[in-house]
Structures are given as C-alpha cells and as structure tokens.
Amino acid sequence: MIVMSCASRAERAADYNDRIVGTQKSIVDALVVMDSTFSDTNATKEWVDLNYADLQARVKRAILALDSIGPFQEDPSLQLSAKELFRSYEALVDFEYKKLVEIKLLPDVSVDMAIVDSNLAVQERIFMQSKIAQERFYKAQEEFGKKYNLEFE
C-alpha cells in the first residue's frame, strides 16, 4: 500500500511538471514563430504585429495559468521557479523583442551597420538572458524531481 501511495504521488508530481512544461512550450512555440517572422524577408507589418501580439498574449496567459495550476501539494517551489522563468520571458518580450520588432519594421533604406549591430546585440542579450533563466528553472525542476522521485530526460 505504501508503494502504491508513493507511485501515485510520483505520478501526480510528473503530471504537475508536465502541465508546467506544457505551458512553457506554448511560450516557446510563439517565440519560434516570432523568430521565424524576423527571418522572413516577406513578412508584412501586419504579420509582424500579429505574431508579436500573440507572443505577448501567450506569455501573459502562461503567467496566469501558473496561478490556476497552483502549488504541488503545498510545495510552491516549481510553480515559483516557473513564474520567475515566465516573468523573464515577459521582460524579454516587452523590451528586447519590442526592439527587434521596431528594427524589423524599419524601411530597408534606414538599415545601416549601426542598426545591424544593434539587432545582433539585442539577439545576444535575448540568448544570454533566456539561457540564464532556463538554467535556473531546470535546476529547480531537478530539485523538484529529486523530492518526488522523478527523472528528467
């Protein structure tokens, strides 16, 4: 009976983790679409604006979803770590991605080496800040897994 209870608890912890990761995946999918939009030389202003608005909305919905998911059995550690990650995404989208949108929408004749350098610098900041935030989340996820006997691939 105890083994069954532990397995059930581990299964619930795995399901909880999967819900959070599914919410994160929604944001990542929108980031991929936005990055593709930046690469698309034929992207219209409307398409850029639409994808940017979708990205902003997904991040905000994900943050709200964490509140409805709640803590796992009174343990808020993974929820709080995910919220920190999603808030990092929110800051990147509201500031760094906004700069990339502004650059993307510049007329071709306005793009000079300074703009190109600025674009590359923003992309580098996004990469580094994302990496740091994701590493923090993965560490919290590993700790959560150890607590509830989960292994992550």
What are these regions (language model features)?
Residues C6-A53, A57, K147-E153:
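Immediate post-signal-peptide N-terminus of mature secreted/exported proteins
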Residues A62-E84, K99-K104:
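Short, solvent-exposed, charged loop/turn and helix-capping segments
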Residues A13-G22, S77-S88:
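Short, charge/polar-rich alpha-helical segments
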Residues T23-S26, L50-R58, K83-E102:
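Amphipathic, heptad-repeat alpha-helices with coiled-coil/zipper character that mediate oligomerization
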Residues S36-D40, R61-E74, S110-L120:
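Short, charged/polar, low-complexity loop and linker segments
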